[in-house]
Amino acid sequence: MTRKPLIAGNWKMNLNHFEAIALVQKIAFSLPDKYFDRVDVTVIPPFTDLRSVQTLVDGDKLRLTYGAQDVSQHDSGAYTGEISGAFLAKLGCTFAVVGHSERRTYHGETDELVAAKATAALKHGLTPIVCIGEQLEVREAGNHVEFNVNSLRGSLAGLSAEQIAQTVIAYEPVWAIGTGRVASAADAQEVCKAIRDELGNLASADVAAGVRVLYGGSVNAKNVGEIVGQGDVDGALVGGASLDGEQFATLSAIAAGGPLP
């Protein structure tokens, strides 16, 4: 099964809504429409930028999509600071990132909570980008494949095969996020293949063949081609490089198979 590459730009806690508009305009200007036939491109801004991004995308009829950096496991109620999937759906979001390593590290999010958030996202018509990844000590001990397979099981616990088919999985080794250190293409392929194999166990071979598995961790225009060229890597969750409109457009074009815009 041919899987269309996905390039997702996670802006993290950067850019106000004015800056968000400028960046989306830059990406749209730098990446001609023809590339979107061969690659899906999405931006993941802070919550406060989403309405502005929605207005621009809808008004200019851009093929770029957008999503949220997190979603509550709750639908509504007395949950101060939480953002419901229903709210995000109203804002036109396509994706919701769940279980990013920074959420797991700084907010103590567990696989169980990530599974609940993924379920909530799906309930509201959002595609969850379910993030897993190991710390450096796990990698150095040689336990990275086992760790990620176990984390995948926990982060998809309770989801049906049909629901799993609607997810995106992002492998983001924690030691490579924002550090400049990048897993080799072979490292990325090793874990992404193990993820796909486990998806086959959790759902079916057909589901596993259709789910997109991304790599995240210091991805840029120089390394994205080799990484996305691996058989089980279907795109990238991009951090810092997604804040540069030209570079993000360039790496999206590379993921589409070129030529450069």
UniProtKB/Swiss-Prot annotation:
Q: Which PROSITE patterns match?
A: TIM_1, TIM_2
The UniProt keywords, alphabetically, are:
Cytoplasm, Gluconeogenesis, Glycolysis, Isomerase
Can you provide one Gene Ontology molecular function annotated for this UniProt record? triose-phosphate isomerase activity
Q: Which reaction does it catalyse?
A: D-glyceraldehyde 3-phosphate = dihydroxyacetone phosphate
- Record bears the keyword Ribosomal protein: no
Q: Does the keyword Lipoprotein apply?
A: no
Enzyme Commission number(s) of this protein: 5.3.1.1
Q: Where in the cell is it found?
A: Cytoplasm
- The positions flagged as active site in the entry are 100, 172
- Identify the PANTHER family for this entry: TRIOSEPHOSPHATE ISOMERASE
NCBIfam families the record matches? tim
Q: How does it assemble?
A: Homodimer.
Report the family membership.
Belongs to the triosephosphate isomerase family.
Q: What is this protein called?
A: Triosephosphate isomerase
Give the originating organism. Answer: Mycolicibacterium gilvum (strain PYR-GCK)
